[in-house]
UniProtKB/Swiss-Prot annotation:
UniProt similarity note: Belongs to the Toll-like receptor family.
Post-translational modification note: Activated by proteolytic cleavage of the flexible loop between repeats LRR14 and LRR15 within the ectodomain. Cleavage requires UNC93B1. Proteolytically processed by first removing the majority of the ectodomain by either asparagine endopeptidase (AEP) or a cathepsin followed by a trimming event that is solely cathepsin mediated and required for optimal receptor signaling. Palmitoylated by ZDHHC3 in the Golgi regulates TLR9 trafficking from the Golgi to endosomes. Depalmitoylation by PPT1 controls the release of TLR9 from UNC93B1 in endosomes.
Lineage: Eukaryota, Metazoa, Chordata, Craniata, Vertebrata
LRR repeat feature ranges: 61-84, 86-109, 121-146, 149-165, 166-189, 197-220, 222-241, 242-267, 282-305, 307-331, 332-355, 362-385, 389-412, 414-439, 469-492, 494-517, 518-541, 543-570, 572-596, 598-620, 625-648, 650-673, 674-697, 699-721, 722-745, 747-770
Protein name: Toll-like receptor 9
Record topology, Extracellular segments: 25-815
Broad class of where this protein is predominantly found: endoplasmic reticulum
TIR domain sequence ranges: 864-1009
Transmembrane segments: 816-836
Designated gene of the protein: TLR9
């Protein structure tokens, strides 16, 4: 955002009137500064608004059904803010005035909502007030269906807060009292406070420090979320009337802190306590969450009567031993999803894991999550009880430290679709010896770091090219310790269709024998390895292979003098997608790729520029891909792209990506050699202008992306002849304008014209504004992302905030001319007057300047009686004699009208007052406190008391009033004196031994007593005390 220049109020008035007139005519976007989206949604997010925008009467306000004001700075909501939106149904006000604990700078904020703010919107159905500093529930309309009051400061819910909300079905009040949003007490829900909400079905009260289940909840509830409170005891009466409950979440109330990723309170000993009949009356319950509850065992009575239970989350407990012998699953025949993740033993990794035989009773189970249990060997005994499950489709075993895995066991599962073994330590197939051993043998391991959990797979760089693994059977072995692949690993896995082996250390030369058992494999991911592609028959054992990812296998290609054979591509009859991205391929590879089936090739992140620099050796590298449709040549260090290079690309190409190269020139006429090309991506290059010719006629180009270049000029008619062009991206360039002549009649057919992030010149009457307004439906982010680059006052601001003062105005021009003429006249007159009567002006100036300090000093004399109080040791007769006969005479008698007023103890102190009263009055009635010292090694008595009062004055008034006069400079100086000499030298004066230096001493002493000490401080060390305003 550029610098802000505050406009004149009259200019703002004229600007507002002009904008209002334009809106009334329907020329500007209707909901400035917000953006209208489909289906009546108005987006006002992240605009730093301080009040709700009141849209113009010309805008179709009756069509607005959703208004989003997320992350603004609205602290006050008025009764009239939403009155004009007669059909508003959804209102989102998140993150406008967050509580102090949730604010990025921890500033306190309190949002004010007037009584009729929401009552004025009788159609409102969904209201989100989360992350705002509100302390009570505002008055709400009876039409409300969904209400979110999460992460606010509301700590009390009473029966009167929701009066009349008979249509309310969803209520969210999470995070009103927890470590990120601290509070003086837990959320208090009065008994029966929500009982009047007869249609409430979803209630969420997570993270509120609740210690018990709120009493007398509505019986209509089907979802109750109470996780991460402090409810450590559950009894039947807590959920007595909730017979319609379908989902219950009470996890995280008695936490397992060794696996917590945030502040955690240890679960008390012998807790939690769940009564055997706690859930027995919840006959409709389908989902139960008991995660992170410090459970060591499960009571069979807990699940009595839960015949409909389909989802059970038992993760992050201590059930590592219990799952090997439990019989609790015998009655859960309807269970579809079971989560047992992170039920590990502290600091222990088991050699084997044998699931209890009762798992075989889960005949409806579809998904089982067992990651983070920590066992080292996976054999047929481990999952034997699961092989009989007819519906099991997804099995998660990642992050278990498994180092030996018998993968063939998955062939016995009749319906298995996905097995996740990623993030383990598998180095090969389990041997018979590894399958034997003691069941309870264990190895100590260190505790997992907080928050460690399996993350998503790295996104493929060309995600549009490679298909996903949503197939019948997928096995994920990514992020393991595989170095070689043997066909024995995949015995009995002929049904496998997708195999992920990315992020291993596979460095062998694949020769066509590694994947022999996988006759049905269609997708193979070998990215992020070290594969040696030397054999011409690599992967030929996979006749149905359709997608092969060999990206990020750069190490073999970086080895000097080693050749690489890519001829295997021609021998894969079903291959359609191939990624060779980011391998640094530059030399000693097959001279030509051939395939009749390949449709998409990702060759980004290589060095095609070096390959094409070798004469004609690799000129036809891609020409043998006869049916190629998509080709990615991004990040190949291409500085030029000759017509012969394009001419030797497959003629079947429809999409060509050349992003992030170094192209400074592109021959647009050469696009005719690619007759079927529909999408061309040239983003992130170094194009300076679109001036060398124009897009040729007759091409099929529909999408052109030249964003993130440095284009500052486009010749007229450049896009005219590309009659099929419908999407054009010109964003993030150096364009000063958008000229309609670039497009001609094509402007009316463009569906997307992106010109955001260009430094547009917002001069008054700029033609591009009218053009963009005519095509505003096709311009994404017109109201917010299309901004000005000049003039400086408007830099970074929307093109619709144009300052009308920059328009040509005759009156303003005359005023500017007169002002400039006056400045020229002054520029001539001032030097002339200085030459003729400069001394007189100098004298008058300094006379006035001298008068001002005197006036200030006269005003100060009314409050300060003395210029300085003199403090010395009367016991030392020599010092007293010097003070009375030298110091007093010099400062009071010999300075004439500049004489100073000194306060001396024996002369000016009042009799009858105590010593301290006189001393305090003297110090606080004097401008300076002067200490006359014979030595500085140690002081006491009156000197010490006076020094402490001077320091007290420094703290109270922020004034340094200390002046030190040392009569014997050669004596030892204390550390304080030496430090003061370094910081404020002029306030420490030394009596000269030679009479010739006494005149200078008295002059410096007079300056030290009449000027403020803060002027004397050495600016290299400090600025000195500043006077409080």
């Amino acid at each position: 955002m550029g610098p802000y220049c505050a406009p004149h109020p009259l200019s703002l008035l004229v600007q507002a009137a002009a904008l209002a007139a334009a809106l009334a005519e329907g020329t500007l976007p209707a909901f400035l500064p917000c953006e209208l989206q489909p289906h009546g949604q108005v987006d006002c997010n992240w605009l730093f608004l301080k009040s709700v925008p009141h849209f113009s009467a010309g805008a179709p306000r009756a069509n607005v059904t959703s208004l989003s004001l997320i992350s603004n700075r609205i602290h006050h909501l008025h009764d009239s803010d939403f009155v004009h939106l007669s059909n508003l149904r959804v209102l989102n006000l998140k993150w406008n005035c967050p509580p102090a604990g949730l604010s990025p700078m921890h500033f306190p904020c309190r949002m004010t909502i007037e009584p009729n703010t929401f009552l004025a919107v009788p159609t409102l159905e969904e209201l989100n007030l989360s992350y705002n500093g509100i302390t009570t529930v505002p008055a709400l309309p009876s039409s409300l269906v969904s209400l979110s009051l999460s992460h606010t400061s509301i700590l009390v819910l009473g029966p009167t807060h929701f009066t009349g909300l008979h249509a309310l079905r969803f209520l969210y009040m999470d995070g009103n009292c927890y470590y990120m949003n601290p509070c003086p007490r837990a959320l208090e829900v009065a008994p029966g406070a929500l009982l009047g909400l007869g249609n409430l079905t979803h209630l969420s009260l997570k993270y509120n420090n609740l210690t018990e289940v709120p009493r007398r909840l509505p019986p209509s509830l089907d979802t109750l979320l109470l996780s991460y409170n402090h409810i450590v005891t559950l009894a039947p009466e807590d959920l007595a009337n909730l017979t319609a409950l379908r989902v219950l979440d009470v996890g995280g109330n008695c936490r397992r802190c060794d696996h917590a990723r945030n502040p955690c309170r240890e679960c008390p000993k012998n807790f939690p306590k769940l009564h055997p009949d706690t859930f027995s009356h919840l006959s409709r319950l389908e989902g139960l969450v008991l995660k992170d509850s410090s459970l060591y065992k499960l009571e069979k009575d807990w699940f009595r009567g839960l015949g409909r239970l389909q989802v059970l989350d038992l993760s992050e407990n201590f059930l590592y031993d219990y799952i090997t012998k439990t019989t609790i699953f015998n009655d859960l025949t309807q269970l579809r999803r079971l989560n047992l993740s992170f039920n590990y033993h502290k600091k222990v990794s088991f050699a084997h894991l044998h699931l209890a035989s009762s798992f075989g009773s889960l005949v409806s189970l579809e998904k089982l999550d067992m990651h983070g249990i920590f066992f080292r060997s996976l054999t047929n005994i481990t999952l034997q009880s699961l092989t009989r499950l007819p519906k099991l489709q997804s099995l998660h075993l990642q992050l278990n430290f498994i180092n030996q895995a018998q993968l063939s066991i998955f062939g016995a599962f009749p319906s298995l679709l996905f097995v996740d073994l990623s993030d383990n330590r598998i180095s090969g197939a389990a041997t018979p010896a590894a399958a034997l051993g003691e069941v309870d043998s264990r190895v100590e391991v260190w505790r997992l770091p907080r928050g460690l959990a399996p993350g998503p797979l790295d996104a493929v760089s060309s995600k549009d090219f490679m298909p996903s693994c949503n197939l019948n059977f997928t096995l994920d072995l990514s992020r393991n310790n595989l170095v070689t692949i043997q066909q024995e690993m995949f015995t009995r896995l002929s049904r496998l269709q997708c195999l992920r082996l990315s992020h291993n250390s596979i460095s062998q030369a694949v020769n066509g024998s590694q994947f022999v058992p996988l006759t049905s494999l269609r997708v193979l991911d070998l990215s992020h390895n070290k594969l040696d592609l030397y054999h011409g028959r690599s992967f030929t054992e996979l006749p149905q292979l359709e997608a092969l990812d060999l990206s990020y296998n750069s190490q073999p290609f970086s080895m000097q003098g080693v050749g690489h054979n890519l001829s295997f591509v021609a021998q894969l009859p079903s291959l359609r997608y191939l990624s060779l991205a980011h391998n640094g391929i530059h030399s000693r590879v097959s001279q030509k790729l051939s395939s009749a089936s390949l449709r998409a090739l990702d060759f980004s992140g290589n060095s095609l520029s070096q390959m094409w620099a070798e004469g004609d050796l690799y000129l036809c590298f891609f020409k043998g891909l006869r049916n190629l449709v998509q080709l990615d040549l991004s990040e190949n260090h291409l500085h030029t792209l000759l017509p012969r290079h394009l001419d030797n690309l497959p003629k079947s190409l429809r999409q060509l990506r050349l992003r992030d190269n170094n192209l400074a020139f592109f021959n647009w006429s050469s696009l005719t050699v690619l007759p079927r090309l529909e999408a061309l991506d040239l983003a992130g290059n170094q194009l300076k202008a679109l001036s060398n010719g124009s897009l040729p006629p007759g091409i099929r180009l529909q999408k052109l992306d030249v964003s993130s270049n440095s284009i500052g000029f486009v010749i007229p008619g450049f896009f005219v002849r590309a009659t099929r062009l419908i999407e054009l991206n010109l964003s993030a360039n150096a364009l000063k304008t958008v000229d309609p002549s670039w497009f001609g009649s094509l402007a009316g057919t463009l569906k997307i014209l992106d010109v955001s992030a260009n430094p547009l010149h917002c001069a008054c009457g700029a033609a591009f504004v009218d053009f963009l307004l005519e095509r505003q439906e096709a311009v994404p982010g017109l109201s917010r992302r299309v901004t000005c680059g000049s003039p400086g006052q408007l830099q970074g601001r929307s093109i619709f905030t144009q300052d009308l003062r920059l328009c040509l105005d005759e009156t303003l021009s005359l005023d500017c001319f007169g002002l400039s003429l006056l400045m020229v006249a002054l520029g001539l007159a001032v030097p002339m007057l200085h030459h003729l009567c400069g001394w007189d002006l100098w004298y008058c100036f300094h006379l006035c300047l001298a008068h001002l300090p005197r006036r200030r000093r006269q005003r100060g004399e009314d409050t300060l009686l003395y210029d300085a109080v003199v403090v010395f040791d009367k016991v030392q007769s020599a010092v007293a004699d010097w003070v009375y006969n030298e110091l007093r005479v010099q400062l009071e008698e010999r300075r004439g009208r500049r004489a100073l007023r000194l306060c001396l103890e024996e002369r000016d102190w009042l009799p009858g007052k105590t010593l301290f009263e006189n001393l305090w009055a003297s110090v606080y009635s004097s401008r300076k406190t002067m200490f006359v010292l014979d030595h500085t090694d140690r002081v006491s008595g009156l000197l010490r008391a006076s020094f402490l009062l001077a320091q007290q004055r420094l703290l109270e008034d922020r004034k340094d009033v200390v002046v030190l006069v040392i009569l014997r400079p050669a004596a030892y100086r204390s550390r304080y004196v030496r430090l003061r000499q370094r910081l404020c030298r002029q306030s420490v004066l030394l009596w000269p031994h030679q009479p010739s230096g006494q005149g200078s001493f008295w002059a410096n002493l007079g300056i030290a007593l009449t000027r403020d000490n803060r002027h004397f401080y050495n600016r290299n060390f400090c600025r000195g005390p500043t006077t409080a305003e």
